[in-house]
Design a protein with these regions (language model features):
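Non-catalytic substrate/cofactor recognition surfaces at enzyme active-site rims
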Residues: 1-142
Length: 142
């Protein structure tokens, strides 16, 4: 259950959408150069505690669902900032995976990633935020 195969990208070379076609060309070139594509991306999460404020810095273009959930679950003064330390891609939420669409399926081509993230993305990110928050003494309310 990894990235699309080289053959899958070759089948996209006749794609009418120029961006999708160019993405397929880049992924084929990467297969030929490296013999494989990345199956995971190192995602940056940073948490700072400044007095009563907990600043959560998340990489990428994070959707509002993350901020709403973290504020609800961590309580207190929580500030969630996206575009922090890396602009890896659009970061969809679990709700969006159920809906599908551009952000979940197609946006990866503009960030030069081989394919969409997996539906458990939100849980992995939120879980790591909670782990880091506990280390700083932030107690979850939920």
């Amino acid at each position: 259950d990894g990235p699309p195969t080289k053959e899958e990208f070759q089948s996209r070379l006749n794609e009418k959408n120029v961006f999708k076609r160019h993405h397929a060309e880049r992924m084929i070139a990467r297969y030929e150069r490296d013999g494989k594509l990345i199956a995971e991306y190192p995602y940056t999460i940073q948490i700072l505690k400044i007095g009563d404020l907990t600043l959560i810095a998340l990489a990428g273009e994070v959707v509002t669902d993350y901020a709403l959930r973290l504020k609800r679950e961590l309580g207190g003064d929580v500030w969630v900032a996206g575009y922090s330390n890396d602009l890896c891609s659009y970061i969809p939420s679990a709700r969006m995976f159920k809906e599908g669409g551009y952000e979940v399926i197609d946006s990866m081509i503009y960030y030069d990633l081989p394919g969409p993230y997996k539906p458990e993305l939100e849980e992995r990110i939120i879980g790591k935020v909670h782990e880091l928050a506990r280390r700083l003494g932030v107690k979850a309310t939920k």
